[in-house]
Amino acid sequence: MYGFIEKDSDLKIEDAVYDEVLNAGLGWMHELKKGQTFRILDIEGNQAVDTTFYDLENPEDHYGAVQTIVAQKNIYLTTGSILRAESGKPLLEITADKTGRHDTLGGACSSQSNTVRYAREKRYMHNCRDSFMLQLADTTADIKKRDLAPNINFFMNVPITKEGGYKFDDGVSAPGKYVEMKALADVMILISNCPQLNNPCNAYNPTCLLYTSPSPRDYAASR
């Protein structure tokens, strides 16, 4: 069920055509052209990153968790994993991975899930669904609330129990760890730098992340 294929990237951050540090709790939306590479770097360690993707040719064809899991016969993602859309279309391939534990089942925290899982007073805490909604409200892309679907939680440690349930455990990432993926189609990336304080997925201390596109040659070729 679980196999970690650790691989370092051949690309250098100093060659990036784009980089941005995102503070804890914020959302981020960015277009990635086919052939470009995208890296998420965990600056301080143990930070969960709620992420989903959309096919820019058909934004309704968003990342599909079931299609991705079934095609690779594995619930976890690592080097070589193909992230697929609902149609089955390959959107991205993970080309480098330094943690090997990326959740495909836990989904994004929300006001409703915080209330059910933790306590009624938690309903007012900022959450990943809020971050997603704020990004969608500002985008000019044809992506709406209806297009939110189960997402990937990069760096998030969600073991499956013997009974078939799942739990949120301490993260396995560390400062400087990263995951890198190459776009197999033109995609829109939607991210929430998870603000969760009620479970150990962020070590109860949400922190900053670095997003880069360290692929100048591919970028130039796609323009």
What are the residue ranges of the model-derived segments?
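Beta-sandwich interaction modules
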Residues: W28, K167-M181
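Low-complexity, serine/threonine/proline-enriched polar segments
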Residues: I69-F154
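Noncatalytic modules at the cell exterior or secretory-pathway interfaces
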Residues: K34-I40, M181-N193
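Conserved beta-strand elements of beta-rich interaction domains across eukaryotes
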Residues: G45, Q196-L197
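Edge beta-strands of jelly-roll/beta-sandwich modules across compartments, strongly enriched
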Residues: D50, P200-T207
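Extracytoplasmic copper-binding redox domains, predominantly the cupredoxin/blue-copper superfamily
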Residues: D50-T52, G88, G106, A185
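Conserved small/polar residues in nucleotide/adenosyl-binding loops
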Residues: Y211-P216
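Solvent-exposed, flexible loop/coil segments flanking beta-strands in beta-rich domains
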Residues: Y2-I75, R223
